[in-house]
Amino acid sequence: MTNTRKSHPLIKIVNHSFIDLPAPSNISAWWNFGSLLGVCLGLQILTGLFLAMHYTADTTTAFSSVTHICRDVNYGWLIRYMHANGASMFFIFLYFHIGRGIYYGSYSFMDTWNIGVLLLFAVMATAFMGYVLPWGQMSFWGATVITNLLSAIPYIGPTLVEWIWGGFSVDKATLTRFFAFHFILPFIITAMVMIHLLFLHETGSNNPSGMNSDSDKIPFHPYYTIKDILGILFMMITLMSLVMFTPDLLGDPDNYTPANPLNTPPHIKPEWYFLFAYAILRSIPNKLGGVLALVFSILILMLFPILHSSKQRSMSFRPLSQCLMWMLVANLLILTWIGGQPVEHPFITIGQLASVTYFFTILILMPSTALMENKLLKW
């Protein structure tokens, strides 16, 4: 008799993806983030669903409905803060996941990588629209500033902005459509994740050495299922500690003030996970130039497979490239810090230098260093 797990049309898909999947024997904890992102997505959809049951997408009641969730709904505060801090965890894992891909050369799986970059854009769009929903000061002004950037697009810009707003300013129509998109996007993201995994399973996972591991594979279950469960346990401990002890640590106090179109906050800034891109945007004293730099700061990820000039795939055995990689990480941390600072001296100059260094490192330094390493190894 055949095993149902291997013969049933639906169950065998799960079997080939999570049970009998041949996986490299040497993948480290850096390979845990994919599963953690999956758990994050599930958690966000679940908590978001319960929040949507009590939320009202109307400018007059949105802020009050969020307050009502926190005060009157059973464990509403828990659901709300798990959703808000879950988004932060999501982005931490996303950045680790991308960093892992860059360090170990996983971007040479071009289909998987490009779908991943599109996923990043989709998640960023979802998070941005979610931040608008509580209709606090930073929600309103964040939405105004970011949507206004589209007016920099030549010819169609101003019309496009009014079309997105559904009027002549960020108002009821904007909030309603942002709620609709914020609700639907995670399901589109889920579908994209499935495509991401489909492409990944065509090639199999990369590993820290960057070499072909076909000769040394182990079954995903039980080895990596137990490893993933440990990662999930650590994630839940971190998330619940954040939610229970310092739920507002990563938020903005301005968002506890209801949105007021007549009063601009002194410092308009997005959530922490967008600050690096926001710093790049602000470092260019031209609207269109800033918007292009902002888009290319993420889109540049798609160039990694093209810019790869080393004879080795991974950075594991390339100390010079490793130095540059960590320089890039430090650079992004500096950009994140600058994004949260007011637009004044010396922050403007630091931001401009960090923005130039970001693009220079990726486009010039990393490929040329890889070529130099090839030469040093007489390859």
Swiss-Prot record:
Gene3D superfamilies: Cytochrome Bc1 Complex, Chain C. Heme b b562 binds at residues 83, 182. One of its GO terms (cellular component) is respiratory chain complex III. The chain crosses the membrane at residues 33-53, 77-98, 113-133, 178-198, 226-246, 288-308, 320-340, 347-367. One of its GO terms (biological process) is mitochondrial electron transport, ubiquinol to cytochrome c. It is found in: Mitochondrion inner membrane. Keywords: Electron transport, Heme, Iron, Membrane, Metal-binding, Mitochondrion, Mitochondrion inner membrane, Respiratory chain, Transmembrane, Transmembrane helix, Transport, Ubiquinone. It is a multi-pass membrane protein. Signal peptide: none annotated. Heme 1 (or BL or b562) is low-potential and absorbs at about 562 nm, and heme 2 (or BH or b566) is high-potential and absorbs at about 566 nm. This is Cytochrome b. It comes from Ctenomys coyhaiquensis.
